[in-house]
């Protein structure tokens, strides 16, 4: 389960504790044991595949899966939600036109948390790293047509931007939530600026993410300093190539790179990068963070680095590019921000920080992470829920 899934699960558990009913509708992969109590998958692997084909050929992302979305509407007609909290509407599983038509017809209040920029563009989920501003006045001739959600044939970015603008600005009662100030400023420049925009930083469970025993890697790697990276799936935008290049820039006798997450076969990973398959256990993840000496985030763009916050909560200092909202996560004491994507500067920061007093640096990181507690996030969302549907 990724960070967005964990947020949804925590919100569902909170609502249940307060005496309300909540269901999580999701598109892909199996639910965990914990999330299965609340979750309902709305499409099959075959449905995801067909949606993917339409995306690859027709650039029809989020306008396929009509049958699956109609099946969702059948559930909603029975469930009769007082409020719908939207998260990611991309991912090969839903038809946004069908969904929004139902929401508008039934006048259901909406909170929409944006975890990227897809809702503002005709195609891509992020544009900041390539300096594109077409999304402000109208996408066309997309430079990232072959990036997620990739289209290998047609470029419908102009038409898709127009369709999304018409659909996404048609809600009667909606609040847009962003996890970072950085993303809220982008939303203010987009067609979504007709709605109220609220910043609610992602929160983490500080009862799970806290400094643990730090000896997980000592038997395997001895006294080497552990440089850690975590991602659900490693991609170019998540910095996989920079980690590969980092191997040759660090002294192998002093440093060991450890990456957690799915690494696709397309990438030739050096044998001296240690890979841990993606884990759904937050307890295991907290132990991994606690055993690292430095957490390195080399993403080209991040809305708000939730894994950065988790690492800090476990006492691990950060080295990261100043991409998107990452600087909001780290604050003044959580680590080092590299403003330009310069690997030499990353290496310098790693070498300087790796040999600082670990106890002192841990305390500073833990204090910074407390700003992003799960409880603060949940309370902010609950206040929004009450405001939109007027319940106590």
Describe each PLM feature range.
Residues 261-286:
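Nucleotide-activated donor-binding/catalytic signature segment of Leloir-type glycosyltransferases, i.e.
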Residues 287-292, 381:
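Short alpha-helical donor nucleotide-sugar binding micro-motif in glycosyltransferases
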Residues 278, 332-343, 352-357:
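Conserved acidic donor-binding segment of nucleotide-sugar-dependent glycosyltransferases
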Residues 177, 220-238, 244-247:
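Conserved donor-binding/catalytic core segment of Leloir-type glycosyltransferases
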